[in-house]
Curated annotation (Swiss-Prot):
Residues passing through the membrane, by range: 8-28, 54-74, 113-133
Mode of membrane association: Multi-pass membrane protein
Family according to the record: Belongs to the cornichon family.
GO terms for cellular component: membrane
Protein name: Protein cornichon homolog 3
InterPro entries (alphabetical): Cornichon
Main location (coarse class): membrane
Naturally occurring in which organism (per UniProt): Arabidopsis thaliana (Mouse-ear cress)
Keywords from the UniProt entry: Membrane, Transmembrane, Transmembrane helix
Keyword flag Transmembrane: yes
GO biological process terms on file: vesicle-mediated transport
Domain of life: Eukaryota
Length: 137
């Protein structure tokens, strides 16, 4: 039963990450269609960038602690990318450059979204597999 709880916790963390990334994409889309100004958009996105990175790091460590090596290895490139951005001070969006980098920022977040969705599908698969395996015992 502990294995099932591991996958449920992982599922909830991934849903939270998915929500944070979709929130960032919505803020960028609102800026693109001129519903909000650049300052508000940048402050909304910058507010959730660090929690996203911390949550992703926690998820990777969680997979390592629970012994799910494949899932931990799957999370390492995303974690490295977030760490790389943070160490070079490029993790936040600059208000003055947001219009110039709008397409690039959207592409980055769409890639992150696809990555999280892939990880989410694998987590759902392992959740179902673990549940059925516990049911047979």
């Amino acid at each position: 039963m502990g294995e099932v709880w591991t996958w449920i916790i992982s599922f909830l963390i991934l849903i939270t990450l998915l929500g944070l990334i979709v929130y960032q994409l919505i803020s960028l889309a609102d800026l693109e269609f001129d519903y909000i100004n650049p300052y508000d958009s940048a402050s909304r996105i910058n507010f959730v960038v660090l929690p996203e990175s911390i949550l992703q790091g926690f998820l990777c460590v969680f997979y390592l602690v629970t012994g799910h090596w494949f899932m931990a290895l799957l999370c390492v490139p995303y974690l490295y990318y977030n760490f790389h951005l943070y160490s070079r001070k490029q993790h936040l969006i600059d208000v003055t450059e947001i219009f110039n980098l709008l397409d690039w920022e959207k592409k980055k977040r769409l890639f992150k979204l696809a990555y999280i969705i892939l990880t989410l599908f694998l987590t759902i698969f392992w959740l179902i597999y673990s549940t059925l395996d516990d049911y047979e015992d």
